[in-house]
Amino acid sequence: MEITFLIGNGFDIGLGMRTQYSQFIPRYIKNGKNKSTVLKDFSEQLGKNIDKWSYFEKQIGEYTLEFSKDNKYDLIDQLEDFEKEFIAYLLEEESKLEFNDSDKIGQFFQETILKFYETLHPESITSIKEVFKTYRASGHNYNFISFNYTQALDKCLEKIPNKKINTRKVSNTIYTDTVGKVVHVHGLCNQFPLIGLNDVEQIKNSELANNPEFVKYLIKPSLNKLHRMGNASNASKMIDTSKIICIYGMSLGETDLLWWNKLVAWLNGGNDRHLIVFEHDDHFSRSSQFGWIRKMDSLIDKLQSYNKNPGIKVESLRDRIHLSLKDIFAYPLLEKERNNQIESFEHKIEKLQDKVDKTTQIYIGKEEPSNAKEGDIWLQVVE
């Protein structure tokens, strides 16, 4: 049996990486001050409307209204410059992760994958267990479709010994459940990363939307075909063969509408297929009878708004759509950064000690030391 996880930026964030567009954009704006006019214009546009650009790819479609057929390739130059800096930023963030504690990392992800459905509501858990019961006499492959450009997910999965999730005995036959394939549907930092829109309709400039030579640079499905890496087709096949699909760390944004539409068609294709959506929400309260139903309604409505499949109503699939508000894969791996900060701080203290009188003591702590004398230095630690 095939179980597939669709993984978004929430995974990298759960490891401690600062990988949201909104966290990168201020740096790009700052760097843009010394660039050519065309590139500087883009950084200034971001600065003026930073709230609108919180969902970057969607805003690209709106931004096309600032261009005409005469300067349309200025937009491509701007996006290329942005992508180059963003990828460098992601690589910098990824380099901060610490993977030395292989055993603990491997054990955490092995156990989390094995128990992925245990944060669901009781009846949902029963439904998922029934699927596993039906396909108990087969090995279970846990596949991953990553929408991230980093390889943080790959590195975590590599820590699982022999990629083995579980071993089961059924009627005297041993079955092994393993980590299957990882497909990066939008490429990697060093392998054709794709930033863009879902379709031509999302290009708000009608003149440019009717220009095929321009459009091919902005539409992700077209970009995937042109690069011939097979990422989209491999991901599509992975979905088709799955019995359970989980969405984790994704906002279900409209620039990936192609995939949400496909999931609706897939779910409708068999009564033994189940979709699980992990929507992290620490502030959700169970003290109201309305909150959970509203969340489910919102999810159903969003999927229906993306649904282009004739004759299919997402509401009719509700019983096989499950929701969890737990952040199951969160596992901070920024120890390297913390150690670097400590080493840097200690180095600064040493330099400070060299500059002051040798009789001067430097104290570090939450409270001022009682034995400090006049002229001593107290560095207060604030948590």
Can you say where each PLM-predicted feature lies in the sequence?
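Phosphate-binding glycine-rich loops of NTP-binding sites
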Residues: N9-F11
